[in-house]
Amino acid sequence: MAEREHDRIPYSVQVEFRTASSFLVAYSVNLSRGGLFVETDADLPTGVLLSFDLQVPGVGFLHLVGVIAWRRGLDSPDGPPGIGIEFQDLAPQLGSAIDKLVSLFRGVQILVLSGDRQDRTTLARSLKSIISTAEILQAADADAAASLLTSDIDLAVVDLDFDPEGALETLRRAQRLSPKVPTVALTASAQLREYARTAGADELATNPPPFGELQVVLVRALSKPVSVRSTATA
């Protein structure tokens, strides 16, 4: 019966997370509450069943079944396009995997690039207050950031206003890594926001960022999968 029910699921989504830490952030914010938002521009209808395969470093593949509860379109002012997925009781499917990942969790590494010492210190304190286990690495210029920016970094937060060219190059460098490092770009300039998008910034925030806005973009960037693929199965 279970196999026949699985055969009737019309859509399948495969989601690959960059690190175990990325998945744990997504779980703590979304999955533990019974849902998940996945960025995708695929035109999937609401109300249908979805086969959902998660690829997580450290535990391999996890299989879930959910329902597409809502969609956000390309032109929405509320954020990137995607689908909101609702799941039923997740404990049987994820319990042992979460226990294993939590036992191995050693926090996240966040690189902060800002040419202003006071701004850099204030930003580092705000990040620590949002994620207390985070290790904050600080860089005063793009050269220092380049020496610290490796695939071991979980997130780079980049101030564009002090040295725009150096900051944009840092965003591009993060994109070139394999796997790429997610980035949050901070700027008070509308033009620099567009440049940051072109350079590959995953999230944008005003500079200096209000605490609530920083919290939203930080969690969203940390929990963002490296790839999302959707296919029709029927």
Task: Put a short name on every predicted segment.
Residues 1-31, 96-138, 227-234:
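N-terminal helix initiation/capping motif
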Residues 150-151, 173-180, 199:
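Conserved phosphotransfer cores of two-component systems
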Residues 209-222:
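C-terminal output helix
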